[in-house]
């Protein structure tokens, strides 16, 4: 159907066009819409090469097996400010500038992690378990284009305000090997924007809808995935701190069955459904501390990351 085909193309374009956000952090820029890499200030300052180190509460995100390195009850929270502009030039030379719906995306992506070493808290009957729960925005986008831009009939605004709730446990088998297991509960929250995936465009005319109408397609759902991880420490110094760490993490894909509406100038035109897949992610890293004493330490870490974007190659509305 022409209406469905038009919105299928528009919604897929909205996810692709939001790639060029600028992150105000010492982190790498990646054209991996809509994935947000930096999920803690310390890890972002190291270019997100943190899978092997994973020794603060953000291990809950980067490598949950690393939570066994923590003692007592620890928390970490923060935010990442996303701003800047997106420049687009069409094959005909037409240009357009997009932004984040203002100078800085608001509300910005944020993260909260709470981690408890159960033995340190007096629950020795549970063995070498560490439990944690976190909340962050590992996927998301927010992009606005002018209503008179060259592709206004495809997109003028898009937002994907996803929230990930992460109940997680880790187990220390011995001083060399730890494992982690967790859930990723993805949902759309009213704390972040309108609480649904949203894309707007200007209608070119036809199908009984006046030309120039502001069109909106939206949808929401809650879904879940899982993650498994390990941390291997073959060498330690005399203080028991790692000199070599090897970390591996697998995050499963998660599938949304979105339900929402087509709107024209704020009035509902039809219901809408779509399937949207968050990709599986494989991460691995090796960290080496050539120097690690009570006075100073120096770490080298090399991480690899594979994201299976082919799983969301198509988006049918």
List PLM regions with ranges.
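Bacterial N-terminal signal peptides
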Residues: 10-25
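N-terminal secretory signal peptides that target proteins for export/translocation
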Residues: 1-9
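Short secondary-structure junctions and interdomain/linker hinges
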Residues: 18, 53, 57, 71-74, ...
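A ubiquitous, low-specificity "background" feature that marks scattered single residues
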Residues: 23-24, 62, 69, 181, ...
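Outer-membrane beta-barrel porins/channels
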Residues: 30-47, 107-317
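Short linear sequence motifs
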Residues: 15-17, 43, 55, 179
């Amino acid at each position: 159907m022409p209406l469905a085909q038009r919105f299928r193309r528009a919604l897929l374009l909205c996810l692709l066009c939001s790639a060029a956000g600028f992150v105000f952090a010492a982190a790498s820029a990646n054209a991996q819409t809509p994935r947000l890499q930096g999920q803690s200030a310390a890890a972002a300052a190291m270019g997100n090469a943190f899978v092997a180190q994973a020794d603060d509460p953000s291990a809950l995100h980067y490598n949950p097996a690393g939570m066994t390195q923590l003692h007592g009850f620890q928390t970490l929270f923060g935010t990442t400010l996303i701003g800047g502009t997106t420049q687009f030039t069409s094959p005909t030379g037409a240009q357009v500038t997009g932004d984040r719906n203002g100078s800085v995306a608001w509300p910005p992506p944020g993260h909260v992690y709470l981690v408890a070493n159960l033995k340190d808290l007096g629950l020795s009957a549970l063995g070498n378990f560490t439990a944690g729960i976190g909340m962050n925005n590992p996927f998301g986008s927010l992009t606005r284009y002018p209503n008179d831009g060259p592709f206004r009939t495809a997109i003028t605004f898009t937002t994907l305000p996803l929230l990930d709730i992460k109940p997680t446990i880790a187990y220390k088998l011995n001083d060399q090997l730890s494992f982690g297991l967790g859930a990723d509960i993805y949902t759309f929250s009213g704390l972040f924007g309108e609480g649904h995936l949203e894309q707007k465009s200007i209608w070119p005319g036809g199908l009984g809808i006046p030309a120039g109408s502001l069109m909106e397609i939206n949808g929401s759902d809650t879904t879940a995935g899982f993650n498994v991880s390990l941390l291997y420490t073959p060498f330690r110094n005399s203080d028991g701190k790692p000199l070599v760490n090897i970390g591996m993490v697998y995050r499963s894909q998660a599938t949304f069955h979105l339900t929402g509406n087509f709107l024209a100038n704020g009035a509902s035109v039809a219901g809408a459904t779509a399937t949207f897949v968050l990709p599986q992610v494989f991460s691995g890293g090796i960290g080496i501390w050539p120097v690690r004493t009570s006075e100073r330490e120096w770490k080298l870490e090399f991480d690899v990351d594979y994201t299976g974007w082919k799983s969301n190659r198509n988006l049918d509305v």
